[in-house]
């Protein structure tokens, strides 16, 4: 898998995974996704603020400027760390217990004649996210309490 496609897959996974509180107990995705979304929104402002602050208060200090540049780069790279983790996670095969749970939800969706994602060998976390998204739209709130 190409390096940049991991980031793209991470963004797709971020947009697909349902933000259900019950899932946050089982999977770390909810916390990672909240942090990544927050970083995508606010870290560019932190980067600009770091450089502007340095330019206002220490205009001629090259050491302060280099520290501000490093701070800005660090702030801009934080969202990429989250997207990279999500991209790797999306392509990881499900653990045994999660795979059983995946097939159980697929059976419930088949009973309602809902189209399911194509799974070649072992289902991945991206497949689970797609199935959970469909389950979120098709099943009532009681479904999440059964989990």
UniProtKB/Swiss-Prot annotation:
Disulfide bonds: none
Membrane-crossing residue ranges in chain numbering: 38-58, 67-87
Alphabetic keyword roster: Cell inner membrane, Cell membrane, Membrane, Transmembrane, Transmembrane helix
Location in or out of the cell: Cell inner membrane
UniProt entry tagged with the keyword Cell inner membrane: yes
GO CC field: plasma membrane
Major location category of this protein: membrane
Amino-acid biosynthesis as UniProt keyword: no
Protein topology in the membrane: Multi-pass membrane protein
Superkingdom per UniProt: Bacteria
NCBIfam families: PRK01816.1
Similarity comment: family membership: Belongs to the UPF0208 family.
Name listed for the protein in its UniProt record: UPF0208 membrane protein CGSHiEE_06015
Organism: Haemophilus influenzae (strain PittEE)
């Amino acid at each position: 898998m190409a390096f940049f496609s991991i980031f793209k897959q991470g963004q797709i996974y971020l947009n697909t995974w349902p933000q259900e509180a019950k899932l946050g107990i089982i999977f770390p995705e909810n916390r990672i996704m909240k942090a990544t979304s927050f970083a995508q929104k606010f870290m560019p402002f932190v980067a600009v603020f770091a450089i502007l602050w340095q330019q206002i208060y220490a205009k001629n200090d090259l050491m302060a400027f280099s520290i501000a540049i490093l701070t800005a780069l660090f702030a801009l790279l934080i969202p990429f760390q989250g997207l990279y983790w999500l991209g790797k996670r999306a392509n990881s095969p499900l653990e045994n217990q999660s795979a059983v749970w995946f097939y159980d939800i697929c059976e419930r969706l088949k009973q309602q004649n809902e189209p399911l994602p194509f799974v070649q060998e072992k289902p991945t976390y991206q497949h689970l996210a797609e199935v959970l998204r469909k389950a979120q739209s098709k099943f009532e709130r009681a479904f999440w309490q059964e989990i």
